[in-house]
Amino acid sequence: MTVTINKSSVPHKVDFATPLSDVICHIKEDGAVIVRGFMDVETIQKLQEEVDTAVEKGSFGPRYQEYNEEAGEIPKHEIYKRGEGKKTKHMKNLALTSETFRNDVLNHKWMHAVCEQIYGEEFGDYWMNCAHILHLEPGEKAQFFHRDTGVYRVSDFRRRLNDPEFMINFLVSLTEFREDNGATQLIPGSHKWDAAHPPTFYGSDEAVPAILEPGDAVVYLGSLFHGAGENRSLDYRRGMIVSMHPAHFTPMESHFHLPKEIVESMTPLAQQMVGWRTMNNQNKIPIWQAGDDKIEDVLRLQHKEVY
C-alpha cells in the first residue's frame, strides 16, 4: 500500500494543551508527531550534566566486522550494528547513571498517557525497551532508513493497517536538531507500508527532518522508517531516545544490575519501567512473576512516593 503525505504539514506539531485524542490520531495517521516543550530547559541541563562524563568516555560505533557490501555479503545479524555510525555514540545505562532520568523521564505523565492509549486496550501494561543518549559528531554520515520493530521477528507477521503497534519511541532533543547537524529524518506514513512497497534505505524524497529545539521531542512508532541525518555542521547533535513496548516483549536493555537502593529511590511506575515489578496483560493476567507472587512483594521492595 502506498500512502501519500503532504510534507509541508507533517509531522504535526503539538504541545501539552493539545487534546490527547488529536495527538493519538496524528501518530496513527502519520506515524509521528513533534511535541514542543516535552521537557523544560532546566531538566535538560541537569540530564546533560549527569550524562556528560559517560558520553565523553564512551566509544564510537560501529562494532562490526568488515564485509563486501557491494557483493551483498553482510549477514543479517551484522546489519543491526551498522545503525551505529562511526562518529556516533550510543550511551546506555541511563537508569543507573542519571537521577533525572529515573525521576523526571521515567515518570513523565504525558509520555505515559500516550503509552496507555497505544497499548492499554491491546496489550495491558508496558515497560521500557531501552533508553540511550544518541550523540552525533560533526562529519557523521546519514544513517540508513530502518524500522525499529525489525528487532521483533513477529513484526513480519503484521498484515493489516489496524494491527496493534509493538513499539513507540520518544526522541528528546538535548541540543538543537537542525537539518545541517543530523536531525532525525522521518518518512511519514511509512508505518503503513506493506510488503508490496519496496523499502527505502537512502536518499528518500519522502523523508522530512524533525527540527527540534532543546526539550522538544519527536514521538514515532517503531514501524516508521527513519534514520539519523548527516551532520554537516561543526557542532555535535545530541538526543535521548526512550523506547517503550508491551510487557509481552523482552526489552533490549536489562536492569537486573541496578542496585536495590537505587531502585527503591524510584516510584512504582518507574520501577515497573525497568522490570522490577510484576505487570498485567490486557486480560489482567500477571506477567513477570516470582512464582505465584509479585516480584515487588517477594523482594520486599520499597519505593519512593508518587512523583
Curated annotation (Swiss-Prot):
GO molecular-function terms, A-Z: dioxygenase activity; metal ion binding
Coiled coil: none
Keywords: Dioxygenase, Iron, Metal-binding, Oxidoreductase
Cited Pfam families: PhyH
A Gene Ontology biological process term: terpenoid biosynthetic process
EC number per UniProt: 1.14.11.-
EC supergroup of this enzyme: oxidoreductase
Alphabetized InterPro entries for the sequence: Phytyl_CoA_dOase-like
Binding site for Fe cation: H146, D148, H226
Known cofactor(s): Fe cation
Gene3D superfamilies reported in the protein's UniProt record: q2cbj1_9rhob like domain
Keyword set includes Oxidoreductase: yes
Catalyzed reactions: verruculide A + 2-oxoglutarate + O2 = chrodrimanin T + succinate + CO2; chrodrimanin E + 2-oxoglutarate + O2 = chrodrimanin A + succinate + CO2
Reported biotechnological use: Compounds in the chrodrimanin family such as chrodrimanin A or verruculide A exhibit strong inhibitory activities against protein tyrosine phosphatase 1B (PTP1B) and therefore, they could potentially be developed into drugs for the treatment of type 2 diabetes or obesity. Furthermore, chrodrimanin B, the end product of the pathway involving chrodrimanin A or verruculide A, does not exhibit the PTP1B inhibitory activity, while it functions as a potent blocker of insect GABA-gated chloride channels.
Pathway given in the UniProt record: Secondary metabolite biosynthesis; terpenoid biosynthesis
UniProt KW Oxidoreductase keyword: yes
Subunit structure: Homodimer.
PANTHER family hit by this protein: MULTIFUNCTIONAL DIOXYGENASE AUSE, PHYTANOYL-COA DIOXYGENASE DOMAIN CONTAINING 1
Function: Dioxygenase; part of the gene cluster that mediates the biosynthesis of chrodrimanin B, a meroterpenoid that acts as a potent blocker of insect GABA-gated chloride channels. The first step of the pathway is the biosynthesis of 6-hydroxymellein by the polyketide synthase cdmE. The prenyltransferase cdmH acts as a 6-hydroxymellein 5-farnesyltransferase and produces the hydrophobic metabolite verruculide C. The FAD-dependent monooxygenase cdmI further converts verruculide C into verruculide B.
Membership in a protein family: Belongs to the PhyH family.
Protein name, per record: Dioxygenase cdmD
Organism: Talaromyces verruculosus
